[in-house]
Amino acid sequence: MTLDLTPDELLSTTRAVRKRLDLDRPVPRRLIEECIDLATQAPTGRNRQRWHFIVVTEPRLRRKVGDIFLRALAAAEGQPLNEHDIRRMNHAPRSTQGVFDGLRHLTDNIHRVPAFVIPAIEGRTDHASAAVQSGTWGSILPATWSFMLAARARGLGTTWTTAQGPLERELAATLGVPYDEVMLAAFIPLAYTIGTDFKPAPRIPRDQVLHWERW
């Protein structure tokens, strides 16, 4: 069963869900597979389809992966933000605080999340040119966002994290992923949501981000 959402409603209400995850309700395998089927309809560079999705639901493995998530977050904590991030944070301090509050709730309950989805792509971008990086990331990010949209349509919540970054090699080894050949693109907690009444989020006004013809 899917929610009765128009395309515009789906696009404007697929939120990063950290607090409103139903941690006691398992996610059926068939629903995850439906979302993956839709994800792989996304565009991919030269139709090479180098994407992969690792889904973790087994309790002991989830605990191991959750531990890596927490240690990776701790490793990233305290790293300096660039000036662009700082400027945007100052633009909406209340929203930023909400993100931190949600992240705290997620980390406190990470071992209770019923499923993790780790999108991956064949080929690494370490020390690659901007053009190579653009082509590689452009072949996994659209599919991952399509997965998240499909999940929302089925009453599931997701949040995009890159917590795997500092400990990507360890996470890859834990999941049997050949690190030298495959890059882990994100770390996505997945669960049913508590309620489905998500709303569009406050955003920077269009006239501050839209540029016609030139910057």
What are these regions (language model features)?
Residues 1-34, 57, 64-67, 75:
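N-terminal accessory segments that position/regulate proteins before the catalytic core
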Residues 37-41, 100-104, 171-174, 195-197:
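Glycine-rich, charged/polar anion/phosphate-binding loops
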Residues 42-47:
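Glycine-rich phosphate/pyrophosphate-binding beta-alpha loops
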Residues 50-51, 113-116, 184-185:
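Short, surface-exposed beta-edge/turn micro-motifs
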Residues 55-138:
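Glycine/small-residue-rich phosphate/adenosyl-binding loop
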Residues 74-86, 175-200:
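A glycine-rich helix N-cap at a beta->alpha junction
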